[in-house]
Amino acid sequence: MSELETGTAAHGTPVENKSVSSSQASTPTNVGSRDDLKVDDDNHSVDAIELPKKPRSAYITVSILCLMVAFGGFVFGWDTGTISGFVNQTDFIRRFGQEKADGSHYLSNVRTGLIVSIFNIGCAIGGIILSKLGDMYGRRIGLMIVVLIYVVGIIIQIASIDKWYQYFIGRIISGLGVGGISVLSPMLISETAPKHIRGTLVSFYQLMITFGIFLGYCTNYGTKTYSNSVQWRVPLGLCFAWAIFMITGMLFVPESPRFLVEKDRIDEAKRSIAKSNKVSYEDPAVQAEVDLICAGVEAERLAGSASIKELFSTKTKVFQRLIMGMLIQSFQQLTGNNYFFYYGTTIFNSVGMDDSFETSIVLGIVNFASTFVAIYVVDKFGRRKCLLWGAAAMTACMVVFASVGVTRLWPDGANHPETASKGAGNCMIVFACFYIFCFATSWAPIAYVVVAESYPLRVKAKCMAIATASNWIWGFLNGFFTPFITSAIHFYYGYVFMGCLVAMFFYVFFFVPETKGLTLEEVQEMWEEGVLPWKSSSWVPSSRRNAGYDVDALQHDEKPWYKAML
């Protein structure tokens, strides 16, 4: 959403409003930056009416509401944190594993990979199919429905006695629900949040993922001493509480004003905007915001209903944005974060930490705590800078981690872990934790932010679903094949992710524009104007430009690519 940062008194209240719609507003002459627009009296310029920017303390209510929506991330994180422990618990292995000749039980790599990773396939399918509920019934009702589907999957898992394929089916169904959540939660937040804290509020989704992972680890640690199905049924049973909390929260969350405008529910859209921005329903800036949304929706209506074919259109640059979203979400998985969580147990064992549950808790704490940093930096420094910094820092960490593992950890080879170097192990632990910090403060939350901000309303649900599905598919491939790969090449696997991280850095620099401080409609305008991504941070929307603004300079660059990077 937009904000009023100009024509205000010292305390952020409007001084004068001279127009009621964005189409009637004149433009400022000072375009020093997107978020610092001033009235220039010498040139008699007046800013467009925008929703006022208030102190962050004024947005406590909307932050809590968005946190309720973001709780969908907790549901996903809880599954990630608990399933990693289930496959190591004795009762789970006895019920769903295979029996050896001596009567003991085990889970093969194939069965483990299927049980853990099939959830991601369910998420990919659910993200594509169930996200349509958001367009049909609204984002809030859509979220309630997919949470109920998730609960059905949990019931099937809890009811499983000793048939692994029953548990397998339950995970597919719960994955369908989580896939729908992963699309609708960031979508609702991005369409409801005030624009100057939108990145922060969308990042709540990742914060809830890490919180769910951490609490899942702690719950596994608490139930590991039991010898019966309490080990895994109690953590699954708690999912009912999470579902009830989220459905109840949706009763208090305002519906997306963009969805409401699309359904011609204008008064409700105005109330939603007023509630999210903590302003009066009668505030002219609310009407101006609705006018801006109406203009965008009307333009999309004139173009006709969106089809799958339109996703591949290059005229509106939807296809370019779809590819960008798919690659951003794929790269998030290819950072290697799951590799660290999988292989972390081996590293920690090398320095005497034999309890894999303790290992998980340590990594979970770093992951969760670091996400608070991301909530601050995403709107402070912008999306591009955070993604570029994250890719560069993770590359450095991965080089050290893999190199020490290959050359120093096991001096007598991987077949003799008993001779592991404690110093090398300590070094790798430090860089593993620093790597997780870098991931949690950059690619973990900001991938969702970029995808949620990049698409026009008419194709948003479809594009977000496809982009998010690419994340789930790579999650499945990573989860299924990592045990086989690490057992074959050990720490050399880190160099594969290092190559992906280098590719990520260059891709972001050349193809991902900055969207910090822009409304979703202004993001659409920037794409249509063909602004070069590395110049996008200097771009100003047409409603805020002066007569001397040169948009052509942002569409071309005479400098070689390596100078542009510098």
UniProtKB/Swiss-Prot annotation:
The gene that this protein is the product of is KHT2
Q: Name one Pfam family in it.
A: Sugar_tr
A cellular component term from Gene Ontology for this protein is: plasma membrane
Q: Which InterPro entries match?
A: MFS_dom, MFS_sugar_transport-like, MFS_Sugar_Transporters, MFS_trans_sf, Sugar/inositol_transpt, Sugar_transporter_CS
Please report the record's description of how this protein sits within the membrane: Multi-pass membrane protein
| Superkingdom of source | Eukaryota
User: What would you give as a GO molecular function for this chain, any one?
Assistant: carbohydrate:proton symporter activity
Q: What is the stated purpose of this protein?
A: Probable glucose transporter.
Q: What is this protein called?
A: Hexose transporter 2
Q: Which residues lie on this side of the membrane: Cytoplasmic?
A: 22-61, 134-140, 188-198, 255-333, 379-385, 450-465, 514-566
> What UniProt keywords apply to this chain's record, in alphabetical order?
Glycoprotein, Membrane, Repeat, Sugar transport, Transmembrane, Transmembrane helix, Transport
Localization, UniProt? Membrane
Q: Biased composition, Polar residues: where in the chain?
A: 16-32
Family membership noted in the UniProt record = Belongs to the major facilitator superfamily. Sugar transporter (TC 2.A.1.1) family.
Q: Which residues are glycosylated?
A: 88
**For side Extracellular, which residue ranges?**
83-112, 162-166, 220-233, 354-357, 407-428, 487-492
Q: Has keyword Cytoplasm?
A: no
Kindly list the residue ranges recorded as spanning the membrane: 62-82, 113-133, 141-161, 167-187, 199-219, 234-254, 334-353, 358-378, 386-406, 429-449, 466-486, 493-513
Q: Which CDD domains match?
A: MFS_HXT
Region (Disordered), start-end ranges: 1-39
What coarse category fits the chief subcellular location reported for this protein? membrane
Q: Which organism is it from?
A: Kluyveromyces lactis (Yeast)
